[in-house]
A protein has these predicted regions:
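Juxtamembrane transmembrane-helix boundary motif
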Residues: 1-17, 31, 36-37, 42, ...
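Hydrophobic alpha-helical segments of membrane proteins
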Residues: 149, 153, 186-193
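Membrane-embedded alpha-helical segments of transport systems
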Residues: 51-59, 84-85, 92, 184-191
Length: 259
């Protein structure tokens, strides 16, 4: 078996593990794994990523719902706004070349890593999951719409944005935000996938294999999320995202200059 295929499958399980543990993060790694490890063309990888992350998030959200850490009402508000944003964002993918698309990923990941590290430092030492305040409906709608646009455009579920938005605008504690984020990601991915389905040809066998491993990872991650401090996981993952961002930007910067 090809060593890159083995590595890609291992990383697929880690993608699911991250989604289950911190309610995001794994989705932003899916496209780079598909492109640079499994050899999928960049535009096709965006659609495949939506399918993989959507199925994985649905499995994780179901487990969180059974544990009482998934708020359906809040998820539906974010999700409804996100669906509209994802449908509008999907056609924008074709406006960028593969190298430009990867540069956009790298830039977004760099911002995400910084935000995750800053949020970790602000919340460190507080594991409270008591809601802070009531749901701010219109702020939630605007935040959901913005995340949806990113989902459709770049093929990311947006959990790294949804979790802090749910804490700030949805009044949820960290663990509840993680569970709720997974269902919002699922809704956004379905909407984004509709926009990409008619534009791309997916390798169904590879998509199914990656999905099975990612779902397995998210089941394990969800079970572990109630035992491990999310702040510690978040800081480690932020460093990983930062390293991947530097790799993507370095690899594609020269290509764009020579275009």
């Amino acid at each position: 078996m090809n060593i890159f295929l083995i590595l890609g499958l291992v990383l697929s399980a880690l993608i699911g593990l991250s989604l289950g543990l911190i309610g995001g993060g794994g989705s932003i790694i899916t496209v780079p794994v598909l492109v640079y490890v499994l050899g999928v063309e960049a535009h096709d990888a965006v659609g495949m990523s939506l399918a993989v992350v959507g199925a994985t998030s649905l499995a994780g959200s179901f487990l969180h719902y059974r544990r009482g850490t998934m708020h359906l009402k809040t998820a539906l508000i974010f999700g409804a706004a996100g669906i509209i944003g994802a449908l509008l964002g999907s056609p924008l993918t074709k406006l960028l070349s593969p190298s430009a698309l990867m540069m956009a990923f790298g830039t977004l990941m760099l911002v995400v890593a910084i935000l995750m590290l800053r949020r970790k430092s602000r919340t460190e030492g507080s594991d409270s999951d008591v809601p802070k305040e009531g749901l701010s409906f219109w702020k939630a709608v605007l935040a959901g719409f913005g995340v949806g646009v990113l989902t459709g455009f770049l093929g990311v579920g947006g959990g790294f944005l949804i979790v802090p938005a749910l804490v700030m605008f949805g009044g949820l504690g960290m663990k509840d935000a993680i569970g709720t984020s997974l269902f919002v990601i699922f809704l956004n991915c379905i909407a984004g996938l509709v926009g990409h389905a008619s534009q791309n040809q997916f390798d169904r066998n590879l998509t199914a294999l990656v999905t099975v491993l990612a779902v397995s990872g998210t089941i394990v991650g969800t079970l572990l999320s109630h035992r491990i401090a999310a702040a510690k996981l978040q800081s480690s993952f932020a460093v990983f995202v930062l390293l991947v961002a530097v790799f993507l930007m370095t690899k594609n910067y020269g290509v764009l200059l020579g275009a």
